[in-house]
Design a protein with these regions (language model features):
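Catalytic cores of carbohydrate-active enzymes across secretory and cytosolic contexts
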Residues: 1-170
Length: 170
């Protein structure tokens, strides 16, 4: 049918462009990028290549680190207020937020968490604390996705209740 009516076929995604996401989800970073290279990147992603001019600029790196840290503080405040969860803003934050599905690799990330847990138990401690955040949902009838969620919840309980490990991994 495409050969007959190519204009009737166009790709749709259930996502959002990274530029729109950046503009609304990380306003401080978006504002800084605009300060550095202007706002053309919002309509033409190739304009982001202009950022390469700043790759060795220590002042730019410092400002990016400041924005990142302020975002961590905002996440910390949100999690405390809305979920009662304490976040160490100096930890490495590893997030995976998407619908649970076998092909979306949440179980691979869970295996990584198990690996880190076993390393810590064996005495190999990370240089910085690691905070892992999973988010998502799964259809009630999708058994494997529900099993992945169950695995992650069990890992969370195991790690958070192990004082030897939870100093380094949450």
């Amino acid at each position: 049918f495409y050969a007959l009516y190519p204009e009737k076929f166009n790709n749709k995604t259930n996502g959002i462009t990274f530029r729109r996401w950046l503009e609304f989800s990380n306003q401080a970073l978006a504002a800084y990028i605009k300060e550095l290279i202007g706002d053309e990147y919002l309509h033409d992603a190739t304009k982001l290549q202009k950022l390469l001019a700043f790759k060795d600029d220590k002042k730019v790196h410092q400002q990016l680190a400041k924005i990142k840290f302020e975002n961590k503080l905002a996440l910390k405040a949100y999690l405390k207020e809305n979920k009662g969860i304490e976040l160490d803003e100096n930890s490495i934050i590893d997030t995976q937020i998407k619908r649970f599905h076998e092909y979306k690799r949440q179980q691979m990330n869970a295996l990584y968490v198990i690996h880190k847990y076993l390393e810590i138990k064996a005495g190999k401690l990370p240089k910085r604390k690691i905070t892992v955040i999973f988010g998502g949902k799964a259809a009630p009838a999708y058994v494997i996705a529900q099993d992945i969620i169950h695995l992650i919840l069990c890992l969370s309980e195991l790690i958070n209740n192990d004082p030897e490990v939870n100093k380094y991994l949450n």
